[in-house]
Structure formats: C-alpha cells, structure tokens
Amino acid sequence: MKKDVLTLGGHEFSSRFILGSGKYNLNLIKAAVENAGAQMITLALRRANTSGGENILDFIPEGVTLLPNTSGARNAEEAVRIARLARAMNCGDFVKVEIIHDSKYLLPDNYETIKATEILAKEGFIVMPYMHADLNVARDLVNAGAACIMPLASPIGSNKGLATKEFIKILVDEIDLPIIVDAGIGRPSQACEAMEMGVAAVMANTAIATAGDIPAMAGAFKQAIEAGRAAYLSGLGRVLDKGASASSPLTGFLED
C-alpha cells in the first residue's frame, strides 16, 4: 500500500496538521505540539528573541519543522526581508508568505504575495503562500514557484469555519500543488470537513489557543484531520438529490 504523506519542497510529513503558534502561552506550546502530532509549526520572528529574553524556539520540541511567517509585512519587499532574516537565524528554508495591509479584516494581498513568492522561490525558499481563495491567483502562484497554496477559510482569528468552501473546492480540483487550508478554522469538525473535500492539510492556531484545554483541543484537531483524510481516501458515499434509498430490504420479510 502506498504511503500517504504530505510532500512539500521535497520534504515528507506524515502529519497533515500544521500548528500555528501566534497566540500561545509559551509554556503550553510543547504539550500542544505533542498532542497535535504536528511535525510543522509556524513561527513569527518577533517571538524568536535572540537578545536573552524568552525565546519561542526554546519551547518547540526537537525535530519539529519550523515554518517562519512574514507576519507584519505590508508588501512583497517587507516579506522578502523577513524571510531572509529567518534564514539568517537558522530557521530553515520554509517560509509562509503572509502579506497584509488591511488592518480591519486582515485579508491577504494576493498580488504582493505573488511578487514575494517569485523572488523567494528563486532564492531557494520553500514558499507556502497565504492567499484569498482565487483560482487565477493560485495559478499565478504555481507559476511563481510556490510549494503549495494556502487559501483562507475565513478571516484570521475569526473561528468562523469554511466560509470560502466552494472556492477551496475549485482549487482542489484545478491546482496540482497541495492545498492547505489556513485561517478561520474554528472547530475540529470544520477541519474534518476540509480534509473530506480533499485538501492536503489544515493549519490551525486561534481555535486551539483560545480553547479551554489547549492540549486536549490540539488532540481533537489531530483526530479530526486524520478522520477527514481517511474518509476522503475511502471515497465518500453518494448523496441523493431527492427521495430515499432503503438500507434494508422492504419486501420478502413478513409474509402470510
């Protein structure tokens, strides 16, 4: 049986759950990562303190792949600068390009994201661009050298779930790269539904960081993502447009 792995930039991951780290108490990160079974975690450089204070890198378990993001970047130039800084800090070649200059809704700037992706891909980064679900933009990101496509489900931190569901389905059908749902997933059930649709992975942060029991919620997401993936690979049962179909014979049971 073929091994089911997520492949990004030539690297293989058995976990399809990418954990965000932006809102955690540092002391809970290790437990969340372990319960999530996550092999990749996002990293905002402002939390990687190299001047002697608390450093998030000290709390991330060994062997977990770092995914530095360009949080705070307002244009391609700033995103490229942050990515280069992350590499200089030995955070590796993965980078999540996140470019936002809309401070109210925190929606990504797709066009600046394309520009940054092209520059960074040429420099050997494994670029994972965060974007608004748009097929034409996704195609441009593929051509720019992206390693995957990361459409938002709903606005960052909203926990509103799969508001862009129909557009994500289009990306799954039309784009050959892994589609990783990012931002807005608020419940394990929503993560499961995304995986059932055929996305390659799910990233979650706020839904876990704001839960009553953070490690337990991380574990719940892990199970939901695994269940959704298994359902997708199994082939979901058909849905009738109308009427019903008995699951047991309606004749030949009670006879005179």
Swiss-Prot record:
GO process terms (BP): thiamine diphosphate biosynthetic process
GO cellular component, one term: cytoplasm
Keywords carried by this UniProt record: Cytoplasm, Schiff base, Thiamine biosynthesis, Transferase
Annotated catalytic residues: K96
Pfam families, A to Z: ThiG (PF05690)
Quaternary context: Homotetramer. Forms heterodimers with either ThiH or ThiS.
Entry protein name: Thiazole synthase
Gene: thiG
